[in-house]
UniProtKB/Swiss-Prot annotation:
Keywords: Apoptosis. The keyword Lipid biosynthesis does not apply. Disruption phenotype: Embryonic lethality with increased frequency of embryonic head defects and reduced embryonic cell death. Plays a role in inducing apoptosis and is involved in the repair of head patterning defects in the embryo caused by extra maternal copies of the homeotic gene bicoid. InterPro entries: bZIP_sf. One of its GO terms (molecular function) is RNA polymerase II cis-regulatory region sequence-specific DNA binding. It comes from Drosophila melanogaster (Fruit fly). Residues 54-77 are annotated as: Disordered. This is Protein Mabiki.
Length: 206
């Protein structure tokens, strides 16, 4: 009996590989913590969530190449490396909030259901904290880009003012030549003022 090989696209295998890695990591996390409500320091939680959130993606998908920017001598802003996020903001993300405590009475569950519930709880915490971390990173990138945009706008405005000043200087250099040419023409014109006419009449009578 011949066995026909079924064609499978590599993206399906890759998706299964990621899911298996996620399940293994969650099982290890559950086995180490024991219960999802055990007390941990904010630094340990931050390290675990960040490493679990980005380890699978970094292993399967290589990082994208950085976009090249047109560097100039006047611009002092450069994105060679992403600036680190403030530790106070990270601690605020992983801070324990009282309003997140479950208020309804506990229900008796089988060990399998309780284990599944613990996995779901840990997965929700990881996804929620990872989302907050991503939002914080995007907000910081927005601030850096807005600062760079303001610096570029200020430089362009200064260059425009400098160009207008140069144009005015060029016009002033051409203007004295025209005025010097017009001065003799104005002197050659006869003066028809009242004082001049009165003086001329007095000279004729004298």
């Amino acid at each position: 009996m011949e066995h026909h090989q079924i064609y499978r696209h590599k993206k399906f295998d890759m998706g299964r590989k990621i899911e298996k890695c996620d399940l293994q990591l969650k099982e290890e996390l559950i086995s180490r913590s024991g219960t999802p409500c055990t007390s941990r320091s904010p630094f340990d939680a931050a390290n675990q969530s960040v490493s679990l959130g980005f380890s699978d993606q970094d292993a399967d998908f290589p990082p994208l190449p950085k976009r090249r920017r047109l560097g100039s001598s006047s611009s002092s802003v450069s994105y060679q490396s992403a600036s680190p996020i403030i530790t106070e903001a990270i601690q605020d993300i992983f801070k324990y909030h009282v309003n997140m405590v479950r208020k309804f009475p506990k229900k008796e569950r089988s060990p399998k259901d309780q284990e599944r519930r613990n996995k779901n709880t840990i997965a929700c915490r990881m996804s929620r904290r990872k989302k907050k971390f991503d939002d914080l990173q995007i907000e910081q990138q927005y601030k850096e880009c807005s600062d760079e945009h303001l610096k570029i706008a200020e430089q362009s405005l200064r260059a425009r003012v400098y160009l207008n000043h140069l144009k005015q200087l060029v016009k002033q250099e051409d203007h004295p030549l025209v005025s010097s040419r017009r001065v003799p023409e104005e002197n050659t014109k006869s003066n028809f003022s009242i004082d001049y006419l009165i003086g001329g009449i007095k000279q004729e009578h004298a």
